[in-house]
């Protein structure tokens, strides 16, 4: 149904330069999905200009930079990034002109609060964080984490790569985050493989809205138009983002509804824990506890005993006709394999995959 909606002639035959009076349906799509995702994110404004997740990160961190610059607080030159973060986080911060400060994870795989307290100061611009994090654990100290950063005058950026685990259950805005990106091409049922197209929707709190890339879609008396934020960072992509992806995402959101979105997240968590339970007696879990939507196995012991590495196992998966999982990531886990079944896999498929892992 997502593909059918995106293929409707009324959408595929649009041109971004045609008069907005003749594109009211398209603007309604942008406005409606922005409102729906704002509710899921716990944010007050959403833009679809960024073309992918890392592009969304770049946009979000530019919002943080614009906020501090606008206030004359130019001493805030550092962005804090945990050592378990996605590699795009430090790259994004550096591209935005910030110095990256890495802080270690604790023994539980979560942010080390003492290390965070030691890292923040008058030069802290913000923190970039994923929750649940890259090892599939929800950081229960998240409110304390965002408070530490806010008390130091910094802002908190939510990397929404793992939003699939918590959407409809808890909102990043309620965790204390000020801005967020979400990969529509990952979490909201749009194409993820084949090179795209992607969409890295960015949401922010009201106080950051004036820095958002313009134009934003607004509605007045049933008519849709554009509004340019007064202190906008400027465009980050031509026109209004990858619109066909937005159509697919809106179809997905409206089809599932609030309860369906929550159920999708809960099923993703259930599936990951099912596979973790089936594999934990054969493989070493990096963190042997209830996970969220993904978990990480370490093949260090297997490698020492047999010489079989994570790479070898991944190649073996190909021999069985299965795509291998993410390898050697996150970097804090040696000989890592990351397993993320998502909400759509059946028990039969997961059983088959687990059996192949164990055979290998």
Describe the predicted segments one by one.
Residues 25-28, 55-223, 307-308, 335:
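Conserved PLP-enzyme active-site core in the AAT-like
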Residues 49, 285-290, 326-331:
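Short beta-strand
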């Amino acid at each position: 149904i997502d593909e059918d909606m995106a293929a409707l002639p009324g959408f595929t035959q649009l041109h971004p330069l045609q008069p907005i009076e003749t594109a009211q349906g398209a603007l309604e799509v942008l406005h409606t999905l922005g409102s729906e995702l704002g509710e899921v994110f716990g944010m007050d404004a959403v833009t679809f200009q960024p073309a992918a997740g890392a592009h969304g990160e770049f946009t979000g961190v530019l919002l943080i930079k614009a906020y501090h610059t606008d206030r004359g607080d130019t001493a805030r030159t550092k962005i804090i990034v945990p050592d378990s973060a996605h590699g795009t986080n430090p790259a994004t911060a550096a591209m935005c002109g910030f110095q990256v400060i890495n802080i270690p994870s604790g023994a539980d795989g979560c942010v080390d609060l003492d290390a965070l307290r030691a890292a923040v100061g008058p030069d802290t611009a913000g923190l970039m964080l994923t929750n649940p994090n890259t090892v599939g654990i929800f950081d229960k100290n998240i409110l304390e984490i965002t408070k530490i950063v806010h008390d130091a005058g910094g802002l908190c950026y939510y990397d929404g790569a793992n939003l699939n685990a918590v959407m409809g259950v808890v909102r990043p805005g309620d965790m204390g985050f000020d801005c967020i990106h979400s990969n529509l091409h990952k979490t909201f049922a749009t194409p993820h493989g084949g090179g795209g197209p992607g969409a890295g929707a960015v949401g922010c709190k009201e106080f950051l809205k004036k820095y958002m890339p313009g134009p934003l879609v607004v509605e007045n008396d049933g008519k849709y138009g554009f509004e340019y934020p007064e202190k906008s960072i400027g465009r980050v992509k031509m026109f209004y983002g990858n619109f066909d992806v937005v159509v697919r995402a809106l179809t997905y959101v409206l089809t599932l509804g609030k309860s369906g979105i929550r159920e999708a997240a809960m099923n993703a968590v259930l599936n990951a824990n099912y596979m973790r339970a089936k594999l934990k007696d054969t493989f070493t879990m990096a963190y042997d506890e209830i996970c969220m939507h993904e978990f990480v196995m370490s093949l260090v012991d297997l490698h020492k005993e047999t010489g079989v590495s994570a790479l070898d196992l991944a190649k073996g998966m190909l021999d069985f006709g299965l795509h291998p999982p993410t390898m050697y990531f996150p970097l804090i886990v040696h000989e890592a394999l990351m397993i993320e079944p998502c909400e759509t896999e059946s028990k039969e498929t997961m059983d088959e995959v687990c059996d192949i892992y164990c055979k290998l």
